[in-house]
Amino acid sequence: VRSAGIGAFDGDIASGGALRAVVEHNLDLSGHRATLLTREVANWANLILVMSVTHFMSVTELGAGEVSSLITSFADGREGGVMLESVPDPAGGTEEEYSETFELIRDLVDKVLQRIGPLGYR
């Protein structure tokens, strides 16, 4: 498992809002450093889950559209071109928006984890 972003600056720390949102759940992002999504990273993956349609388009431009899905679509069992809602980006938002986004992502990841075992992703 790797994490990368299309607007990330390599080595950046998580935003203050993200750091505070995870503390409520006894998690720690202080060691997290951003990684820019490159063609090399995209080609390494056998599954890329993105938060928005814009992210999906960027991954497709890197040549990894076939292994990519919007996380909301994948979690709902509708990957393969079906696009559901994007995950809202809380950047610059309120603490409440960061907390709500954390909850949404946590729920989506739980659903994704239930799916990837039977599908044979490793």
Predicted stretch roles:
Residues 1-45, 114-122:
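Conserved active-site segments centered on acidic
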